[in-house]
């Protein structure tokens, strides 16, 4: 038959028989593991071996080195926006952060443009001296400028976390907007600048040097005031309230704690947290304010307008003379529990003051004093010339002034006026104290 060439099946030359491989292993001695992998996979294996080798050497050189483990959370493609701010996500609920001590480092856009992120004036320009008060969202400090320690200001620091958690973003922005757009008035505390950082909102406010504190502290320390002191305080606050009403602002929180006395005893209205833009002739129905100063119109849940501020002013004047509330509401904890019966008529006062209280605190709106024009013409304020009142030509009673300032000087007001005019652009009606410069957080 001859030599017949055996044909190989296609692909047989690519195979290495298992038996043949075992024979090679037996010939070499112990079985050896041979890597039959591609080049990329082999390179990856070599990198792992090299990493293990370096790690072992590092452990030998540094025996005190401890292995730290980190919990890697799955990335969420959606932005970390609270449910009550953006409702487009349906049933999406962001879990609570594990480290609550860290404040929220975002949401700058929520507070723009009332609180810009870049400002010439920032928290590093002042030295905090003492705490003046604490509010729902932060603290108010008395501060002095670094370049001039004698100039005093009030700096309000509000936490973004508290504002967002209590859903008060619009309220805080409304307060800052009203104060920034409001023109200057001698009996309203001015707002010089506002800005924000990653965690806080800041407001630079007027605070008179040598102030005796708020009206509540003065009344608590010195007791009931004389009618002469009450007359001037009432006239100055009435002028401030009428100025707000003329600028379509309803205040809604007139009380002793929101009035600060300067070193000479003149009144300054502060804290616009509950103020609201409201045009003349319009009405609103939000139930807000301090319970003991709340008018029947607000407590009943109906609609009301600017005239509720005059009721609150009447309660304030009544407390300054008698030391008690005009109605038995000192223990009330809800607006539904307020009682407007058993009116406490002031005793030991002049007939004019008693008549003023009767008219300002009348439950019926038809018999109540509800305008500045009527109050201006009341006999109790006959000795006050309201045209000269804003020039502070009247000297307050010595019982409410600061003994260290026995004479009145207008240099302080001149500095404040210059600063305010520099920071207020009448043409556009906006506070332009801040320029576009970086603030390093």
Curated annotation (Swiss-Prot):
Family stated for the protein in its record: Belongs to the protein kinase superfamily. Ser/Thr protein kinase family.
Enzyme Commission identifier(s): 2.7.11.1
Record's protein name: Putative serine/threonine-protein kinase F31E3.2
Keywords: ATP-binding, Kinase, Nucleotide-binding, Serine/threonine-protein kinase, Transferase
Transmembrane segments: none
Gene3D superfamilies for the chain: Phosphorylase Kinase, domain 1, Transferase(Phosphotransferase) domain 1
Binding site for ATP: 132-140, 156
Domain Protein kinase: 126-381
Catalytic reaction equation(s): L-seryl-[protein] + ATP = O-phospho-L-seryl-[protein] + ADP + H(+); L-threonyl-[protein] + ATP = O-phospho-L-threonyl-[protein] + ADP + H(+)
Basic residues bias spans: 1-16
GO terms for MF: ATP binding; protein kinase activity; protein serine kinase activity; protein serine/threonine kinase activity
